[in-house]
UniProtKB/Swiss-Prot annotation:
GO MF annotations in UniProt: aminomethyltransferase activity; transaminase activity
Lineage: Bacteria, Pseudomonadati, Pseudomonadota, Gammaproteobacteria, Enterobacterales
Top-rank taxon: Bacteria
Organism listed in the record: Serratia proteamaculans (strain 568)
GO CC terms, sorted: cytosol; glycine cleavage complex
Stated name of the protein: Aminomethyltransferase
Length: 365
């Protein structure tokens, strides 16, 4: 039996088509995925992300523990509330999960991890936390709502108390603050400004209804996927998993190689991969008719005349751009053009950096 978030009845009342998403009944769309996508790019939309797992870590050695557990380095987090994005790797350098970690106090950090990886994440964290005396608290008492879009902050602020408005004033991206009952973070998965707000489950229905009244449009998993794809953001299980190196998933920037004496899980394997070379994640654009779909083959010929093949990890029509885009994992040496096999047709595609739209503006020519 699939689980329900506290907002399940609200989704049904809004006309959602509900689907099983990694064991959770979640809204795919509320009638029009395209309209929901445009609402987030042009105005303000909201997502129920209560299926994600919030984990609080406490203990005197929490920072030391996270410096070992994560590929990025929480030593960078010196200002309370500051967050960073990181991979959590296995010993062979594969990605167990990608997550956000918040520094709250010297003995208190918060992680937000994916729903699909919840059980293995918790088991892995608990196993490695024990020697450090770090205590885990899974915050199943909290719901999580993402409010995203150019008008998102303004609309959300109409629900805030004076204390909460003051707490978020001038807050830069990738920060979080506890203000009253709300944990308000300037993070998201859309390439737009906005907040991800954690609050007690018993308050979330009222909060959702007030956001609706403020003109924030509900958006489902379908729009969430096209928005994150346009923004060039990875989806766990597609761009990366335990068999894929972060170096092959456009996550090299999340690996803190310095200081050289910091040992973290997967470091030794990553150093070998970096020396040997890995596949890479690229963006693809196809302006001709047709749609780039997951798992389609991508072929190119390198400068030496050798033919290579990769695979599309995520592909879709881009509502913002009006043509098809994709992320693809390919061997090194790809140039500016490639071929994608769509049924019996070989379609030319342009190769770009991963990332096509940010803050409503195209990044591509």
């Amino acid at each position: 039996m699939a689980k329900q978030t506290p907002l399940y009845d609200q989704h049904v009342a809004c006309g959602a088509r509900m689907v099983d998403f990694h064991g959770w009944m979640m809204p795919l769309h509320y009638g029009s995925q395209i309209d929901e996508h445009h609402a987030v790019r042009q105005d303000a939309g909201m997502f129920d992300v209560s299926h994600m797992t919030i984990v609080d870590l406490r203990g005197a050695r929490t920072r030391e523990f996270l410096r070992y557990l994560l590929a990025n380095d929480v030593a960078k987090l010196t200002q309370p509330g500051k967050a960073l994005y990181t991979g959590m790797l296995n010993a062979s350098g594969g990605v167990i999960d990608d997550l956000i970690v918040y520094f709250l106090t010297e003995d208190y950090f918060r992680l937000v991890v994916n729903s699909a990886t919840r059980e293995k994440d918790l088991a892995w964290i608990e196993e490695h936390a024990a020697p450090y005396g770090v205590a885990l608290t899974v915050r199943d008492d909290l719901a999580l709502v993402a409010v995203q879009g150019p008008q998102a902050k303004e609309r959300a602020a109409t629900l805030f108390t004076p204390e909460q408005k003051s707490a978020v004033e001038g807050m830069k991206p990738f920060f979080g603050v506890q203000a009253g009952d709300l944990f308000i973070a300037t993070t998201g998965y859309t390439g737009e400004a906005g907040y991800e707000i954690a609050l007690p489950k018993e308050q979330v229905v009222d909060f959702w209804q007030k956001l609706l009244a403020a003109g924030v449009k509900p958006a489902g998993l379908g729009a969430r996927d096209t928005l994150r794809l346009e923004a060039g953001m990875n989806l766990y299980g597609q761009e990366m998993d335990e068999g894929v190196s972060p170096l092959a998933a456009n996550m090299g920037w999340t690996i803190a190689w310095l200081p050289e004496d910091r040992q973290f899980i997967g470091r030794e394997a990553l150093e070998k991969q970096r020396e040997m070379g890995t596949e890479q994640l690229v963006g693809l654009i196809m302006t001709e008719k047709g749609v780039l779909r997951n798992e389609l083959p991508v072929r190119f010929t390198d400068e030496a005349g050798q033919t290579h093949e990769g695979i599309i990890t995520s592909g879709s029509f881009s509502p913002t751009l009006g043509f098809s885009i994709a992320l693809a994992r390919v061997p090194a040496g790809i140039g500016e053009q490639a071929i994608v096999q769509i049924r019996n047709r070989e379609m030319p595609v342009k190769v770009t950096k991963p990332g096509f739209v940010r803050a409503g503006k195209p990044l591509t020519n």
